[in-house]
A protein has these predicted regions:
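P-loop (Walker A) phosphate-binding loop of NTP-binding proteins
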Residues: 46
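Post-Walker A alpha-helix
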Residues: 54-55
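Hydrophobic anchor at the beta1->P-loop junction of P-loop NTPases
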Residues: 41-43
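Conserved glycine(s) of the Walker
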Residues: 49-50
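Switch- and interface-adjacent substructures of P-loop NTPase systems
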Residues: 27-28, 35, 61-345
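N-terminal pre-Walker A segment at the start of P-loop NTPase domains
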Residues: 2-35
Length: 347
């Protein structure tokens, strides 16, 4: 009994320490934001849209800001930048700035490798103050610009949060009516339309159709389409253990109440559960833990490629942009709500 009590006390002590460290870390972030000492920028876009090139260029401009001619960067214009350092961000791989520079400066120049996972870099700017507060706060100050890079394919899934499997299937059914998607689906379209949602779930059959659906998603991307869900299925070797599911494209023929009351072993119920599991275990944690600290969001779109793909591709992009623009990414704190423009924070 004493050993059990001792074990519980140790666990309680550990939990208290972890909670305290987490609280202090969060408090530090709030203080930094309140005094304009830190800003976090999220950068995303489909693979090939230029994220790595954009971030490499942005870091390079900030590192050599005294020579870059950044009109809005007053401290740089007045030659008050003392040093710029690149730091790692806790919990993220370091963005490979040097690889980007090497690729762009090679002979002949090459594009940097596309983003396949999360990465981040903190650009720490040390500068001389130009303020009446110099006597109180000191002549120099530090401002951190954190840049987070992540695949745009991850962003595609965020609108799924709060959307039921049934409504997602209805959306996918409407998309399948587009000529380009109908062509890409081929025989798979008839298979997904013909499935009886009340039939008993057959794992082997579902896995075969799942592989065909993944190939269809990749073909959509190759054709320049933008609204592709689930987006994680586009990334090779990414989340191989994620739930196996796909949309049923004939659900408009069935009564909604009957579908809701379907047997737990039916195709519809199992698919619904796996869809929700995908959202709960993959999409929601990404939204909660990644976006909570982001102050600005940059989304890069290869508009020229989309436009050259035709009217369907253009309308597809408009729908996608509309979905991500209206999605609530995170709950903003008060310290996060009254942000100054980026370079206004460096005075």
């Amino acid at each position: 009994m004493l050993d059990n009590l001792t074990s519980k006390l140790k666990k309680l002590t550990t939990d208290v320490k972890e909670s305290t460290h987490s609280l202090l870390d969060d408090a530090g972030k709030v203080v930094d934001r309140a005094f304009d000492k830190h800003i976090c920028i999220g950068v995303t876009g489909f693979s090939g849209s230029g994220k790595s090139t954009f971030i490499t260029s942005l870091i390079h401009q900030l590192r050599y800001s005294n020579e870059a001619g950044l009109a809005s960067f007053l401290a740089a214009r007045e030659q008050r930048i003392l040093e710029v350092n690149l730091l790692s961000s806790q919990g993220f791989d370091l963005f490979d700035y040097q690889e980007g520079i090497s690729a762009l400066s090679a002979k002949p120049p090459q594009w940097p490798q596309p983003t396949q996972s999360l990465s981040s870099v903190i650009v720490q700017i040390v500068y001389k103050r130009n303020s009446v507060l110099n006597r109180v706060l000191g002549e120099t100050s530090t401002f951190n610009i954190e840049i987070r890079d992540y695949p745009g394919e991850w962003l595609l899934d965020l609108p799924l949060i709060g959307q039921s499997y049934l409504n997602w299937c209805f959306d996918q059914t409407d998309l399948a009516k587009q000529a380009v998607r109908k062509h890409l689906l081929g025989d798979l379209l008839q298979h997904l339309q013909a499935i009886n949602p009340f039939d008993v779930f057959d794992e082997s059959q579902i896995k075969q159709l799942h592989q065909q659906f993944k190939r269809y998603l990749r073909q959509c991307k190759e054709e320049g389409l933008t609204l592709i869900q689930p987006g994680r299925m586009l990334l090779e070797d990414e989340h191989n253990e994620s739930p196996v599911f796909f949309p049923l494209l004939g659900l408009h023929h069935y009564d909604k109440t009957a579908l809701a009351d379907a047997n737990d072993k039916s195709i519809y119920k199992v698919m619904s559960q796996r869809y929700q599991s995908y959202i709960d275990t993959i999409v929601t944690p990404f939204n909660k833990h990644f976006f909570d600290d982001i102050d600005r969001q940059v989304v890069l779109v290869d508009a020229l490629k989309v436009i050259s793909g035709g009217q369907d591709n253009f309308e597809d992009m408009k729908t996608w942009v509309g979905k991500i623009a209206t999605f609530t990414y995170f709950e903003r704190t008060k310290a996060n709500s009254y942000r100054h423009p980026l370079f206004k924070a460096i005075r």
